[in-house]
Amino acid sequence: MLQALLIFVLQIIYVPILTIRTILLVKNQTRSAAAVGLLEGAIYIVSLGIVFQDLSNWMNIVAYVIGFSAGLLLGGYIENKLAIGYITYQVSLLDRCNELVDELRHSGFGVTVFEGEGINSIRYRLDIVAKRSREKELLEIINEIAPKAFMSSYEIRSFKGGYLTKAMKKRALMKKKDHHAS
């Protein structure tokens, strides 16, 4: 019974680590992924080793499977809280909606406005790049000012140039100055 409990706990630790490592790889953060992978591998070997010691012990197998499933739930929750990386939203509007553009820019979001031809009239599209950790804030602003906007989103693997890159460089310089001043 203690072995089954240990296996369950190890799976609840292992699977979220596996989830985070996978996300780091997808986000092209290979060094961080490799570091996390060390811990992941150690836990995996210990847990699976206990299960393989006695394959007739069904409690250990059930603990492994249920722990894996619970670990997936926990891993998804942790990933959403960490919100690693960046996201792009494409927002389609019937009018230019300068109020929305101004509010997004005032809130520190990079916004590019495009004018396009819809079936019956001119349409406007906003491309907005944001840290995933600010996605909720972004959606609140859009929903408050343009609740009927059509939105689609996708995650960014990498990017170069633009407003967001300049803003990040500025923040890094300010942190350096603050660090040297103290």
From Swiss-Prot:
Membrane topology value: Multi-pass membrane protein
Ranges annotated as spanning the membrane: 6-26, 32-52, 58-78
Main location: membrane
Example of a GO cellular component annotation carried by this entry: plasma membrane
InterPro entries, A to Z: DUF2179, DUF5698, UPF0316
Coiled coil: none
Keywords: Cell membrane, Membrane, Transmembrane, Transmembrane helix
Compartment annotation: Cell membrane
Homology family: Belongs to the UPF0316 family.
Protein name: UPF0316 protein BCQ_3166
Native source organism of the sequence: Bacillus cereus (strain Q1)
